[in-house]
Amino acid sequence: MKISKMDMSPMLNAYPDSVENNIEGMLGFLQKEEAQDIFGSFYILPSIFNTDLDRGFSIIDYNLNEIYATENDLDKLKELGINLKFDFVLNHASVLSKQFQDIIKKGQESEYKDFFINWNKFWEGKGEMTEEGYIQPYPELIQKMFFRKPGLPILMVRMPNGENVPYWNTFYQEVRYDKVQEQDLMQALQLQYLTALEIAKMVNDQLEKGVIPANVELGRFEKYKKQVVEYVESHRKYLGQMDLNIKSPLVWEYYDDTLRTLAEYGAKIVRLDAFAYAPKEPGEKNFLNEPGTWNLLERIQQLADKYELTLLPEIHSSYEEKTYEILSQKGYMAYDFFLPGLIIDAFEEQSGEMLEKWAQEILDKQINVVNMLGCHDGIPLLDLKGLIKDEQIQRLIDTVVGRGGFVKNLHGQKNVYYQVNATYYSALGEDDRKMLISRAVQLFMPGKPQVWYLDLFAGKNDYEAVRRAGAGGHKEINRTNLSMEDIEEALKKDVVMTQLKLLRFRKNFPAFEKMNNIKIQAVG
C-alpha cells in the first residue's frame, strides 16, 4: 500500500543486540515505567535475520537469528502496541544463501543458475574476453557506470567442473582458502605422507602471507604444483553480497516470499535497502536507472500491497538532485536525510532560516518523510548540497570532525565524503541543551520521527569500539552496545528523561496525528 493513514508516532531504531546483546534486552527497557507509551514503532536492523556480514546487510535468509530474537520476542513487542519496521535488501543476497550455494554445488545444473547476474552473460557481445576469463565491457558502455569499489564489480566463482565464472558483485567480497591438511592432501593427490606434510606446510605459510594459490612456490615439489593448486582452488570459500538478477522469475518469487515473511513478523514499514542498484542495463549508470528503478518499485509495491506494507525506499542523494521529491510524487515515503545536518548548521550559523525553508517545502509539496538525528550510519552532510552552500557543508564536516568524528573517503575518492561518523550527541559538542533542542525540533518537524537508541541515551563517540573493529570500523563509533546498568545510569540524567517526556508528548498529543496544518516560523 502506498501511503494512506500513516502511524506518525515515534519509532525506536536499534540493532537487535544494542541492549544486553539481544531483543530481550531492549524489551526490558521498553517495559520500564520510564519508557511506557513512548514508541509506536521499532525499526530493528537486519542482523535480526540470518546474516553473515555488514552488520546484517548481507542476508542469508530472513529467518530470525536465534542468537538475537525469537518470535515470542516479536509477540511481546506487539503486546506493547509497537509495530515493526524491517529491511528488505533488494539488490543482493549473501554468497551463503541457499540459492548461491546451490550454484556453487551444481553449476549450470542448478535451478538458480540465473538467480544472480552472470557477468559474462550480461555483457555478451558488448566487450572483449580477458585472459582471466571475464568480459571487459567496451569503454563507452561503462563510462557512466557507478562503482562502489575499484575495478569491475565481479567475483570469480569456481564451478564444479573447475570453470571460473564471474558474477556481479557490487558490494563486499572475500575469497578464503582453508588450511591444507596433510592427510587430506595425501589421499587426494596420492602422495607419500611426509611429502604431503611438507607441501601442506609450504602452502599454508604462503597462503597466510596473502600469496594466491597460482603463485605458491613448492621448491623441490614443484612437479606437484598443478595438482596442488587445483586441490586448493577446489576448496575455495567465499564471503560477499551477490547481485540478484531481477529479470529472473525466481527472484520475484523470493521477493514475494520475503515480504510475506516480514508482514508475518509484524512489519508495517519495509525499508528498501540498495534498491537503486538492482536495475542494470549496458551503457547505463546502473544506479537509479530510469525508468528501470521506478518500474522495479512499482512491481515491489504490487507485492507489498498484498501484505498491507508501506514501502520506504532508502537512497542518499543530494538535495539538488530532488530524488526525495520524485519519490514523493510517485507516492512513496522518503527519508529526511537533510534534517540532521540542518540542525547542526542552525547552531553553528546561529540561524534557523534553512530549517524553516526545508520544513515549509515538506509541507508545501506534501512530502511524507521519516526523519532522524542519528542512525546506524553516519551523519549525511553531503546530502545538503544544493540546499546550503558548499562552504557551509565543509564547515559542518570540519566541525563534526573537530569534535571527534571520523570521515571515510567515498569509494577511494580523496576528499569526497559520503557521511561523517559520530554520535549525534558528540557532533553537538556533547551539549545537553543542544541535544534537547535538536530532539524538540525533530519532533515538531513534519514526518514520522525515528530515534536512534544511542541518541536517546546521550551516547558519546566510542573510540574503543572503532579500535576493536579495525580497518573500516569507523561506523562503530556510533553503535555502542549497552547493558541494563548503562541504561539505569542514563535514566538518571535530565538529558535522557527530558527526551522521553518530549517523545511521550509527541506520541500522544492529537495534533501530531495529522501535521498538514503546521505553521513554520524561524526566530533568530
Set out the residue ranges of the language-model regions:
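Active-site and adjacent substrate-binding regions of carbohydrate-active enzymes
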Residues: 1-524
